[in-house]
């Protein structure tokens, strides 16, 4: 009897979440109808929960697969304006395609599906997305944020949103991806957005590259450095410029196949270490690059940046 009731509850949830590509959510051991509408994390809200359309100017979740979202969301955002501001910071991560369920996971929190009870992501969904995306975030100097710690989410035998696409069989042998820091923008706007997300921008020569603990270390030549954006760099940083490419020992970076000539590098200073965020071969004939360097300080930096900011709780 209990198993049958549990199966019925699972079927009801699967129907309600049908817009999420028809993927099952497991509810065999959870009394869905017994859920209480308690304040999230002990916080009380000035307004009762409401459902509204996911707007087009919430691009993180507008194409997630369902039309209506619940407010307050599962990150304690009470207004749509707050959701938009915080969610926009995660668009760069979504664009990196570090896991096929990144959008489903993030939108289950930022724009939860409109039901009369909050439905959390399963812990396994969080862990799968974290395994795919945390190394990429670490490469840019951003730890997996506290608000997304997977122990906060229910186990898969509870009523929750399970992995949607992560179990699909591979249709082709895996291809080694280019290092994240070596993915290039080809427009001036793209370059300037990268500059917005970086603490410093330097034109430099690279003397040598070393492999150390799974990272690459780019050691700059003593001379012929030009600081285009100094940010937090101090004299000791620029005297012997050493840039760390996190988690990049085993991935290709075509720009660094030859160290001849100069490079345009962008990075962040994290815990005293200079992390490389982007690298380009310097090309004085490249009009887009010349334009970006000339006008980077007058460019209206997007709210998406610095890269992955908004991963912390709002202040």
UniProtKB/Swiss-Prot annotation:
A GO term from the CC aspect: extracellular space
SUPFAM superfamilies: Frizzled cysteine-rich domain, TIMP-like
Pfam families recorded: Fz, NTR
Cross-referenced InterPro entries: Frizzled/SFRP (IPR015526), Frizzled_dom (IPR020067), Frizzled_dom_sf (IPR036790), Netrin_domain (IPR001134), Netrin_module_non-TIMP (IPR018933), SFRP5_CRD (IPR041761), TIMP-like_OB-fold (IPR008993)
GO biological process, one term: cell differentiation
UniProt GO molecular function: Wnt-protein binding
Disulfide topology: 51-114, 61-107, 98-133, 122-160, 126-150, 179-251, 182-253, 196-301
Sorted UniProt keywords: Developmental protein, Differentiation, Disulfide bond, Secreted, Signal, Wnt signaling pathway
Primary location recorded for the protein, binned into one broad class: secreted
Domain comment as written in the entry: The FZ domain is involved in binding with Wnt ligands.
The protein's name in its UniProt record: Secreted frizzled-related protein 5
């Amino acid at each position: 009897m209990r198993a049958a009731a549990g199966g019925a509850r699972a079927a009801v949830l699967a129907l309600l979440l049908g817009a999420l590509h028809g993927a099952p959510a497991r509810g065999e051991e959870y009394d869905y109808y017994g859920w209480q509408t308690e304040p999230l994390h002990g916080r009380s809200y000035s307004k009762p929960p409401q459902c509204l359309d996911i707007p087009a100017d919430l691009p993180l979740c507008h194409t997630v697969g369902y039309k209506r979202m619940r407010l307050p969301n599962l990150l304690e955002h009470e207004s749509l304006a707050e959701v938009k501001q915080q969610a926009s910071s995660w668009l760069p991560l979504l664009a990196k395609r570090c896991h096929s369920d990144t959008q489903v996971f993030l939108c289950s929190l930022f724009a939860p599906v409109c039901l009369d009870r909050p439905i959390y992501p399963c812990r396994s969904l969080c862990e799968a997305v974290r395994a795919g995306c945390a190394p990429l975030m670490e490469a840019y100097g951003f730890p997996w944020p506290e608000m997304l710690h997977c122990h906060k989410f229910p186990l898969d035998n509870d009523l929750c949103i399970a992995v949607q696409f992560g179990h699909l069989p591979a249709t082709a042998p895996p291809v080694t991806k280019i290092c994240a820091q070596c993915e290039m923008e080809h427009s001036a706007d793209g370059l300037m957005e990268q500059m917005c997300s970086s603490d410093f921008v330097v034109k430099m020569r690279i003397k040598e590259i070393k492999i150390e603990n799974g990272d690459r270390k780019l050691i700059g030549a003593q001379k012929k450095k030009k600081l285009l954006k100094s940010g937090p760099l101090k004299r000791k940083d620029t005297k012997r410029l050493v840039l760390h490419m996190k988690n990049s020992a085993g991935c290709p970076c075509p720009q660094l196949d030859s160290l001849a000539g100069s490079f345009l590098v962008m990075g962040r200073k994290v815990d005293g270490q200079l992390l490389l965020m982007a690298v380009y071969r310097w090309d004085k004939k490249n009009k887009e690059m010349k334009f970006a360097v000339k006008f980077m300080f007058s460019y209206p930096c997007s709210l998406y940046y610095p890269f992955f900011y908004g991963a912390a709780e709002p202040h």
